[in-house]
Amino acid sequence: MENQLKTHVRVLVIGGGVVGVSTLYHLTKKGWTDVALIERTELTAGSTWHAAGLLPLFNMSYTVGQLHKYSVDLYKRLPAETGQDVSFHVSGNLRLATCRERMDEYQKYCGTANTIGVPFEVISPKRVKELWPLMELGGSPQTPAIIGALYHPDDGHIAPADLTMALRKGARAAGAEIYEHTEATAFERTISGEWLVRTGKGDITAEHLVLATGNYARQTGRLLGLNVPAIPVEHQYIVYDESPELKAYRQGGGRELAVLRESDQSYYLREERMGWILGPYEKGAPARFADGVPDWFGRSLFPGDLDRL
């Protein structure tokens, strides 16, 4: 049974996706236990439900790279801390290169990775084939030859919903409150400088607000008189049924293949059961829901439109 809505907290997080719940969890780790989160429908509905769960350690920024490394380390220890599996597949990640400029970028990254402490290898085509034996290395007019890659052995993919539930469990164990089916309908600034948040289940006053509403950021911003310049775009991905080649490889004792990324052709590929998920980063993806994301889209998909890829 859900607890009765508190009337006052130090921090109120709006939005129950992985970002909002992670914020709540980390507030408790900093000793801020008088905190709460409200979610208009159910946890993970929205951006988290639609996410592919990729965990790219690669980043040329020292600051962002540290954040990525911290996240991967957190996912490894969360199950022991909370008792909740996060479905973290440490399959590794291969970022392919088909041109010298891409290999130069990977060489430049070495300094950042070494400073942060991220394990990596800049590898040859032969090593790529060893790690990904189902791959054809190319070399035709239609398929550029692979000249090398950047390999992160600690990378992989995760189930965003499972991760959210683990963070939820950790936050609640530390004293945080979570209220689902509780939509923020209005915000008012009080004389004391605090925030009065009106919901369908009553009002709650907070010293601080954290807005983590993802696709709904524009709508939340309007309630505060803000124009949030964030509009969702339609992204297509392809889920392949069982692959005979992959099935034979895995049943023959092969380990889970690393997540593939190809920056020049702009796509990722990873295993999904005995099939594949292919996600092309299409150019000119159409904007959607500029006036607001409808209620029904929390766990829905766009119709297929592969012709524009």
Range-by-range predicted roles:
Residues 19, 43, 216:
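Conserved Rossmann-like nucleotide-cofactor binding loop
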Residues 150-208, 216:
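Helical element adjacent to the flavin cofactor pocket in flavoenzyme catalytic cores
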Residues 53-134, 264-269, 273-277, 287:
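Dinucleotide-binding Rossmann-like beta1-alpha1 core, especially the glycine-rich loop
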Residues 6-8, 86-95, 109, 129-174, ...:
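Helix-loop-beta segment of a Rossmann-like dinucleotide-binding subdomain
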Residues 28-49:
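Glycine-rich FAD pyrophosphate-binding loop
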Residues 226-227, 243-309:
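Active-site lid/adjacent beta-loop-alpha segment flanking the redox-cofactor pocket in flavoenzymes
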